[in-house]
């Protein structure tokens, strides 16, 4: 592995610090703006030379963009697959930019600029994906950061824009504002009370969609759902953001009510189930990714319900991300087999819980 995480601002993991609102329920908020450079074919139709020129144009502009003044450029197209996977696991690049499946091989010119609180993916589905990632439920702060970046970068790079349709994008659902606002939210209460289907159906009726831990194409694991807007055309950024905020606040309220119902109607059963999850994590010698996510979901719920004390949400956030396969390989300094990763994952979790152990709340 060649990636040096010490070069990244805060290791690219400041969004894990549990500092935002409702951090026990909402892991993170992301605002992303899709932009294309005028005069070039969209990334999927562009030749290698065009994509490299897009990257060169952005690289030339960066010194004059205050939001990116201290950014680090990572050439994703020159990285080994494990490094690309690590960036994806850390939510710094998309699966498509990282080229992690046969449908989306890594493209020439694929890169990412990472700054303190914003980033720009280059040559993903669109030429540029501007993004801000925040801890907890912080859509206003995330939007303010990415809007500032958009304004600064737009003054240096000509974006493809149509007076009637707005910002032009490779996928028609992004045309208009080009904005995708998403919240990664933990909903075990609604799952356990079997209310989750109603909530998810309601999201779709209100023009929102849900996905798994890593967005489009990913499965729901550990009771984490990514809620986001579906389309952008015909609505302003403020309207899209306000709608998402109102709906997510309602979902948070529903989750909090479900947790109260669980404690009231099945207190001992739930407490036993969650402490069993903690015990497994504390002493298991091998854990698959899905096992770890599901047990961590239980412990996270227990911490939220104050059944377990002395264990921070920040630690749980780190366990969620850093116990994935590429992070384990990075820590070990070599590629791991599935069985080796299971052993390394269990050891990593045990050590973290031994350092910051939970006690009865």
Task: Label every PLM stretch briefly.
Residues 186-189, 195:
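Structural signature of FAD isoalloxazine-binding scaffolds in flavoprotein oxidoreductases
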Residues 166-183:
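Conserved phosphate/anionic-ligand binding catalytic regions in large, soluble enzymes, centered on
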Residues 1-164, 179, 193, 198-361:
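Long, Pro/Ser/Thr-rich low-complexity/intrinsically disordered regulatory tracts in eukaryotic proteins
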């Amino acid at each position: 592995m060649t990636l040096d995480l010490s070069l990244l601002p805060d290791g690219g993991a400041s969004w894990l610090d549990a500092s935002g609102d409702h951090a026990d329920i909402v892991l993170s908020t992301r605002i992303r703006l899709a932009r294309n450079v005028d005069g070039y074919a969209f990334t999927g139709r562009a030749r290698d030379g065009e994509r490299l020129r897009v990257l060169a144009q952005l690289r030339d502009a960066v010194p004059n963009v205050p939001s990116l003044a201290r950014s680090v450029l990572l050439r994703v197209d020159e990285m080994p697959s494990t490094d690309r996977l690590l960036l994806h696991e850390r939510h710094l690049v998309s699966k498509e930019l990282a080229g992690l499946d046969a449908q989306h091989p890594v493209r020439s010119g694929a890169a990412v600029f990472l700054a303190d609180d914003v980033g720009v993916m280059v040559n993903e589905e669109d030429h540029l994906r501007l993004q801000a990632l925040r801890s907890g439920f912080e859509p206003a702060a995330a939007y303010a950061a990415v809007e500032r970046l958009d304004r600064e970068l737009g003054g240096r790079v000509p974006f493809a824009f149509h007076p009637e349709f707005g910002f032009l994008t490779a996928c028609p659902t992004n045309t208009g504002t080009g904005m995708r606002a998403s919240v990664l939210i933990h909903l075990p209460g609604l799952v356990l009370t079997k209310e989750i289907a109603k909530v998810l159906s309601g999201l779709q009726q209100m023009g929102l969609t849900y996905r798994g831990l890593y967005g489009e194409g990913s499965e729901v694991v550990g009771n984490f759902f990514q809620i986001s807007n579906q389309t952008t055309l015909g609505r302003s950024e403020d309207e899209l953001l306000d709608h998402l905020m109102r709906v997510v606040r309602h979902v948070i309220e529903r989750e909090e009510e479900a947790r109260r119902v669980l404690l009231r109607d099945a207190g001992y059963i739930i407490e036993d189930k969650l402490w069993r999850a903690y015990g497994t994590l504390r002493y298991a010698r091998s854990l698959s990714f899905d096992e770890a996510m599901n047990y961590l979901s239980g412990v996270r719920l227990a911490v939220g319900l104050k059944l377990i004390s002395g264990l921070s949400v920040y630690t749980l956030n780190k366990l969620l991300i850093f116990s994935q396969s590429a992070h384990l390989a990075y820590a070990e300094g070599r590629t791991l087999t599935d069985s080796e990763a299971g052993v390394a994952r269990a050891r990593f979790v045990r050590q973290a819980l031994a350092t910051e152990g939970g006690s009865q709340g």
